[in-house]
Curated annotation (Swiss-Prot):
Keywords per UniProt: Membrane, Mitochondrion, Mitochondrion outer membrane, Transmembrane, Transmembrane beta strand
Primary subcellular site in the record, as a coarse category: mitochondrion
Name of protein: Mitochondrial distribution and morphology protein 10
Record has Mitochondrion as a keyword: yes
Membrane topology (UniProt): Multi-pass membrane protein
Region (Disordered): 358-377
InterPro entries named among the record's database cross-references: Mdm10
Lineage of the organism: Eukaryota, Fungi, Dikarya, Ascomycota, Pezizomycotina
GO biological process: establishment of mitochondrion localization; mitochondrial genome maintenance; mitochondrial outer membrane translocase complex assembly; mitochondrion-endoplasmic reticulum membrane tethering; phospholipid transport; protein insertion into mitochondrial outer membrane
């Protein structure tokens, strides 16, 4: 389950219209969410708050064996007025990553009109209207004290700058300066392709990541053009450190259906469409990826599909051409809808729906209703198993006003363990 600060950072990316899917680092995001989730190993309590539309705080306390905690603060020039901040109102799918529908590439917005994006024209400051900025700092206690700081800034409609600092205090009797490292990342996204340039002071590491989308350029597409049904992307990454002579590289492909592929054509709203026209291009969304690391000889393929709005499956097969070792992992997630309050009028609604003509429903209304139905979930169950019969089970859901995560890991050589992880968000009480 995502921390509250990570949730706010995702809201910042969505509010500033930054496409997280158009990046090589997100090539296998869906498979990683379904197969590489971790089960909690200790009791941890989070108390977070969005005290103002621009300022958020978070406190963490961990127990069982070792008591530790952290204090986090976040400030954004973009207000989060319309972002749900109470644990009872936040959609669970925002906090528990699962199958993620890849968004179609879009052209960058040349005129940043954040007033219309966030529907909050009163609180947007003109000095930051063109360059949204986010500041985040976390102090981990007890000693050794670690400070993590993050700086995000949209330099231009196509440029995104990220600065991350990590500093760890040395032993109490040591007179040496605290160890610190800086990671700088500059992202450039045009919709058709994206590039990321990285530099880390740790071993003077330089890096590059790039992604190319096949098909028409969204910058030259018109509003009357037919929506794309699928997306094929190719990308690569490379790293080099002159200090440690470290070299790394990988390449990958991704094919994914887009939302338009599973939608019923608009011509069916009139009721005169043929049988072929009323059938969607794909019965369910799916994503396929292929990644290759030439230096280590590792090859990995993933296949993820969303069989229904509340059920998703994923599998991964990895093979090493040098050692002949292989890996097979399979997993799924099952969402549970929240029970609707029965007002005794469901019989009347069914009768009204049966008597309505076929021309009344429209595609936007169906899409909105489907989205609201998907967000009306209060728990999710994730299961994964590998070729060695190591099983992980994770449950995340709501208990009263708390968001709770509990998991168990079972294996032939490991003792079973089960810990509970509690994540509580109590915010917006003063607004």
């Amino acid at each position: 389950m995502l921390d509250f600060m990570d949730y706010i950072q995702l809201a910042f990316a969505e509010g500033t219209n930054w496409n997280r899917d158009n990046s090589y680092s997100s090539l296998t995001a869906t498979a990683q969410s379904l197969l590489d989730f971790s089960t909690p190993e200790r009791l941890r309590v989070h108390l977070s708050s969005l005290s103002t539309p621009n300022f958020a705080t978070s406190y963490t306390l961990g127990t069982v064996g070792l008591i530790d905690g952290s204090v986090s603060y976040l400030y954004s020039t973009v207000p989060f007025t319309n972002t749900p901040s109470r644990s009872a109102l936040i959609p669970l799918r925002k906090l528990s990553p699962g199958y993620r529908q890849v968004a179609p590439p879009s052209a960058p917005i040349e005129d940043w009109n954040l007033d219309s994006i966030l529907d909050n024209p009163q609180n947007v400051q003109p000095s930051f209207a063109s360059k949204p900025t986010l500041l985040h700092a976390t102090l981990h206690l007890p000693p050794p004290t670690t400070l993590n700081a993050l700086f995000l800034r949209r330099i231009s409609p196509t440029m995104h700058l990220t600065l991350a600092v990590c500093s760890t205090r040395g032993p109490p009797l040591s007179k040496s300066a605290p160890q610190a490292s800086l990671l700088m990342q500059l992202s450039h996204d045009t919709g058709k392709y994206s590039n990321e340039y990285l530099f880390s002071t740790d071993n003077a590491l330089f890096g590059w990541r790039g992604l190319w989308n096949f098909g028409p350029d969204p910058r030259s597409s018109t509003d009357t053009a037919a929506p794309r049904l699928s997306l094929l992307s190719a990308g690569a990454e490379a790293y080099y450190s002159p200090v440690s002579s470290l070299i790394g590289m990988s390449t990958g492909l991704r094919f994914s259906t887009l939302p338009a592929a599973t939608d019923v054509p608009a011509s069916t709203a009139t009721g005169f469409a043929t049988a072929n026209q009323s059938t969607p291009i794909s019965t369910f969304p799916y994503t396929l990826t292929l990644t290759l690391t030439p230096l280590t000889g590792s090859l990995s393929t993933t296949y993820s599909l969303r069989a229904s709005p509340n059920l998703a499956f994923s599998s991964r097969f990895g093979f090493n051409v040098y050692s002949w070792e292989s890996e097979m992992v399979a997993g799924c997630e099952l969402w549970r809808k929240s029970r609707k309050q029965d007002d005794g009028l469901e019989w009347a609604r069914r009768k009204m729906r049966a008597s309505e003509p076929l021309s009344l429903p429209s595609l936007p209304a169906e899409s909105k209703e489907r989205q609201e139905e998907e967000e009306a979930t209060d728990s999710v169950l994730k299961i994964r198993v590998d070729q060695s019969w190591n099983v992980r089970v994770l449950w995340e859901g709501r208990v009263k006003e708390l968001l709770v995560s509990a998991g168990v890991g079972l294996g032939p050589s490991d003792t079973a363990f089960a810990w509970m992880y509690i994540f509580s968000v109590r915010a917006g009480l003063n607004r």
